[in-house]
Amino acid sequence: MTLSWPSPAKLNLFLYITGKRPDGYHNLQTLFQFLDYGDTLTFTPRNDTQLTILTPVEGVADEDNLIIKAAKLLRQYCYQHHIPLRYQGADISIDKKLPMGGGLGGGSSNAATTLIALNYHWQAGLSDETLATLGVTLGADVPVFVKGHAAFAEGIGEILTPASPKECWYLVAHPGISIPTPTIFTDPELKRNSPIRSLGALLQAPFANDCEMIARKRFREVEYLLSWLLEYAPSRLTGTGACVFGEFESQEAASEVLINAPEWVHGFVAQGVNISPVHLFRSRIPVLLHP
């Protein structure tokens, strides 16, 4: 059975860095929400063990693609735990809409969708909790995509508490550049001492992103784009960038700003959703049983 699975974007509605750990990672507090917009991954199970990307991503070798890494990780876990699989290979196509290095979680989302989809197609029968534990070895953001609910994240992003922020409409704009995460986190001027607060306190305060000042200072494209968007709506950087987003009360309001935007502005309008489109899709497809 061939199925096309959503691989949604995420936004960091706020992001505060509360300290740097001895191992070099940063402790943070952030609020993840999904978007009803993203990539689409199509999986066709194979009777052999081949894992083939039919639509290679430019600049990313197959062996470095998180999709392939996730598939191999799932298969290896099942081998090690003597879990029988209906299939062990797959042909995979990617309809790529999310920019790399954009702060929208595209790679992590692809990995999570792969774990969820192949768990279904291969009939491995693993729980989302197990898939999330596998996923964190691929990236700190993978578990939130696997678990599929908007969440308040702490620690390095691995401590998740389900949350239900308002499902607003957003204009998400991309400045045409990629920002590697280490570029932001290694900057000596990055704020690393935000106070640790409860989710309730954070929801009552104006939302902000501690990475934004560095991104605006080091990348003029981000500065120009955010300055433009702030004229129309409360706007922030997502993650470590490079994408920015403005918050609107309606799809029409966000779309009107995008339609009338300068030619150099590239973006899309999407709604924030607290249940991942991947989980909604999975709930609507038939349960597969071993023959």
From Swiss-Prot:
Which residues of this protein are catalytic? K10, D141
Gene Ontology terms for molecular function? 4-(cytidine 5'-diphospho)-2-C-methyl-D-erythritol kinase activity; ATP binding
> Which superkingdom does the taxonomy of this entry point to?
Bacteria
Q: Which InterPro entries match?
A: GHMP_kinase_C_dom, GHMP_kinase_C_sf, GHMP_kinase_N_dom, IspE, Ribosomal_Su5_D2-typ_SF, Ribsml_uS5_D2-typ_fold_subgr
EC identifiers of the protein: 2.7.1.148
| Entry-linked Gene3D superfamilies | 3.30.230.10, GHMP kinase, C-terminal domain
Set out the biological process GO terms recorded for this chain's protein.
isopentenyl diphosphate biosynthetic process, methylerythritol 4-phosphate pathway; terpenoid biosynthetic process
Q: Tell me, what's a Pfam family for it?
A: GHMP_kinases_N
Q: Which reaction does it catalyse?
A: 4-CDP-2-C-methyl-D-erythritol + ATP = 4-CDP-2-C-methyl-D-erythritol 2-phosphate + ADP + H(+)
Q: Which UniProt keywords apply?
A: ATP-binding, Isoprene biosynthesis, Kinase, Nucleotide-binding, Transferase
Q: Which residues participate in ATP binding?
A: P99, M100, G101, G102, G103, L104, G105, G106, G107, S108, S109
* Pathway stated in the Swiss-Prot or TrEMBL entry: Isoprenoid biosynthesis; isopentenyl diphosphate biosynthesis via DXP pathway; isopentenyl diphosphate from 1-deoxy-D-xylulose 5-phosphate: step 3/6
HAMAP family registered for this protein in UniProt? IspE
Please give the PANTHER family that the UniProt record associates with this protein: 4-DIPHOSPHOCYTIDYL-2-C-METHYL-D-ERYTHRITOL KINASE, CHLOROPLASTIC (PTHR43527:SF2)
Give the family this protein belongs to, as stated in its UniProt record: Belongs to the GHMP kinase family. IspE subfamily.
Q: What does this protein do?
A: Catalyzes the phosphorylation of the position 2 hydroxy group of 4-diphosphocytidyl-2C-methyl-D-erythritol.
**What interactions and quaternary structure are annotated?**
Homodimer.
Q: What is this protein called?
A: 4-diphosphocytidyl-2-C-methyl-D-erythritol kinase
Q: Which organism is it from?
A: Proteus mirabilis (strain HI4320)
